[in-house]
Amino acid sequence: MSSGKRSLQKRIAYEAAKILTELRTDNLAYACRKAAAKHGVTKQQLMPSRDEIEQALKEQQRLVLGDKQHTALNQLRESALDAMQALKQFQPLLVGPVLQGTADDNSHIELHLQADTPEEVLFALSDLHIPWQEKQRQLNFSDGSHETIPCFRFSADEIQYLLMVFPNAKNRKRPLDPFDHKPFQSANIKQLKALLDEEHSAGSDYYEEAFPLSRETSRG
């Protein structure tokens, strides 16, 4: 890679991180497009990677939010674990900024669930006395297909949750992250517990040192 291209990607990543921090949004794709447009870039090959943007975002958050971000992130991960344990029959996976380590107190918790039908998840939410809003999301999958996925939003203890419900299949095709078109990075209950235990024992602000990310393949 040329030094000029590398420098441009770093500038776009920094600008995207600045947008994400200032707008308090998790929309990585929007921030990247807006940052690229500011630099007159439209070619995909000149865009920074997810890792580059997230690293720049963590640096911005440390400067702007300080300990406030780390405290919010830890609370969100603890709340995510509670929700995953309450919904463990659906083999939940945590995805998104709460897992990546870039969430703040304006972020929501996003979980991927497996169920034979979406109604099974609704019954579980009803049993937990949780009111919800039904949504839909368009996603691409690892086999090249494109599908509409049922989603359910709810709020608990002033934290927003988004549940995405996928078919309960033995060899389920993997949903792709809209930003980089790769399988979502994810953590199951066991992995999230390990992450929290590691963070509590080490007191580390650095997510990548505490827990290696994996693409969405495992549950439990």
What do these predicted regions represent?
Residues 2-25, 32-105, 115-220:
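Catalytic core of pol beta-like nucleotidyltransferases
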